[in-house]
Amino acid sequence: MNSPCDRLQQFIQVLLEESWSFPSFANTLHWPENLLSYIDELVWQGSLQNFHQHEVRFDKPPLRLPLTGFSSLTENWSSRQAVSSRLVATAASPPAGCQAPIAFLGLKFSSLGPARKNPALCFLYDQSNSKCNTSWVKENVGCPWHWCNIHEALIRTEKGSDPMFYVNTSTGGRDGFNGFNLQISDPWDPRWASGVDGGLYEHKTFMYPVAKIRIARTLKTTVTGLSDLASSIQSAEKELTSQLQPAADQAKSSRFSWLTLISEGAQLLQSTGVQNLSHCFLCAALRRPPLVAVPLPTPFNYTINSSTPIPPVPKGQVPLFSDPIRHKFPFCYSTPNASWCNQTRMLTSTPAPPRGYFWCNSTLTKVLNSTGNHTLCLPISLIPGLTLYSQDELSHLLAWTEPRPQNKSKWAIFLPLVLGISLASSLVASGLGKGALTHSIQTSQDLSTHLQLAIEASAESLDSLQRQITTVAQVAAQNRQALDLLMAEKGRTCLFLQEECCYYLNESGVVENSLQTLKKKKSSKRS
């Protein structure tokens, strides 16, 4: 009987022979990224044929999945009489019974310093000579003799060459350095469960290691929790979909996605007169709220009669955009500090017009009954919290590896920063303060109204959206299928740039979400 690995290889080979379009097929079936990493390794070994014609590569380490072995690599070193410890990398093992190798990718050791030289690793478990198993060796993790087994960082250039420790030669990375890769050929051997110690050397000829490393494997059985979590996400998505759709469109199949949020931002940029939007990227961050409250320059002048129902408002907190150019709010209904606002007007009771809100201490409301000096209350409009990059700026970002460079804010343009000025002037010119808040989104006939309808129609809508994003962010590193619930639409997804989901604006300013197009642009930026 064939082993699980053999059957998996046969299954993958059949799929490829049927001429599937792999990018679309992979995203439609939600192939886990550690499986794709495993496929990539099979290709390298020559087990699969004609695979690289699909031009699919994955640079990130395998993701943690339920019911898999989860291995970690820790570095311990001393510097100036201080002992430091750092988790360098993690990797997911295949299911028990399938002895496929795993790899720690892009290892960057803090103890090596900027020189990096030509490092080597020494492990205690694979020493065959008795002189390399003395108490001194075990205490110092030392391999001072040439007959000890030492794994030097090599460049894997041929299929026949399969070193354990080798240089990461993938493109990109700062200064052209992408770290090192460490391959474990037998991840389910019992020794990895108890933990394996080793030494890291700046060069194989050095007597003492610069750091000690430890590799350990644990078995994760989180399938029940992830199943429940996926079910909750799907239920929340169905609830949100029904809230997003107008009554006339309830029968149509539609759902909220990152593309909807990005489209809102692109159309809003165009309708407010922002120029030169072609060949740009709009990005939404998982860890950032989808909407931002932008303060408006003048008070609301809007009245409703007693029979007009007051629409509900989104629950939860919405962050307030702070303009770095103007350090004061243009108008406040109340403030605990007069220096915060250019103008303040005390009110006893007033309603907000359609698509307008009162922002009071991080909470949104449609009716302002009373204010006090201890509360900051502002008239606001909700804007998608997106980041705008040019192609050159995106190229700069793609050239860096994790963590994201600290000076990102010097070139990234936050959408509310652009719209906070242009939107304010356009709203005043279009009738703000004369009985109606004419939001620029309202004038665009071809713009999807889903997001605004959700905000106006149900108090639960924003809460539901935020809950989904928060939930997905928690499992994004564990389950790519859950991430695709919001990011993918029928085999298409965004360009996932570190922690952001990015879409390309073509020559006409239209959002383009073809995965293949974006991956080509990503490749061209890295070359």
Swiss-Prot record:
A motif (CX6CC) lies at residues 494-502. Residues 412-527 are annotated as: Transmembrane protein. A motif (CXXC) lies at residues 280-283. InterPro entries: TLV/ENV_coat_polyprotein. Residues 412-432 are annotated as: Fusion peptide. Its main location: virion. It holds the Pfam family TLV_coat. One of its GO terms (biological process) is viral translational frameshifting. Orthologs in P.troglodytes (truncated), G.gorilla (truncated). This is Endogenous retrovirus group FC1 member 1 Env polyprotein.
